[in-house]
């Protein structure tokens, strides 16, 4: 990142807002570090596909990862795909389908229960919750098929 990009980046984050919608890893790191330093509770959110499951979460700020999406690398011959956390499962399945492939696990789609429409969520939410469908006993869970991931903690 150039010096000019760093200056623009630092001034573009308004920490007075309640919902952050970063689109880069650097923005995510900056937001998490800042909230950690100030002891601000932070809810991590994506496509809201699982927000009606479990207890309500009370946080001062929300880190919405729905803008941090996209397929970074896909090698069909290697059965390998690298994506950002906010990438919708539907986008991943669409890319795989073009090569006559599918996910090795079965992501749940709770959208039909809550809104009557499909919403299988983002890959980040699926990995975080480790939800898988009825084929889980035979083919394994989400994390069984995960080769790696990059995370962010309060120190960056």
Please place each PLM-identified region on the residue numbering.
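A charged N-terminal "starter" segment
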Residues: 1-2
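Intrinsic disorder at enzyme termini
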Residues: 5-10
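FAD-binding subdomain of flavoenzyme oxidoreductases
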Residues: 105-106, 110, 115-156
């Amino acid at each position: 990142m150039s010096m000019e990009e760093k200056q623009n980046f630092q001034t573009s984050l308004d920490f007075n807002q309640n919902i952050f919608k970063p689109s880069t890893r650097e923005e995510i790191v900056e937001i998490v570090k800042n909230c950690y330093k100030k002891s601000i509770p932070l809810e991590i959110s994506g496509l809201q596909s699982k927000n009606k499951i479990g207890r309500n979460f009370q946080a001062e700020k929300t880190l919405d990862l729905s803008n941090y999406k996209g397929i970074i690398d896909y090698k069909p011959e290697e059965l390998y795909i690298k994506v950002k956390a906010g990438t919708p499962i539907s986008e991943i399945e669409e890319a795989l389908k073009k090569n006559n492939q599918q996910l090795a696990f079965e992501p749940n789609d709770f959208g039909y229960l809550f809104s009557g429409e499909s919403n299988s969520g983002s890959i980040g939410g699926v990995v975080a919750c480790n939800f898988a469908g009825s084929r889980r006993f035979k083919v394994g869970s989400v994390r069984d098929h995960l080769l790696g991931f990059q995370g962010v903690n309060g120190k960056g």
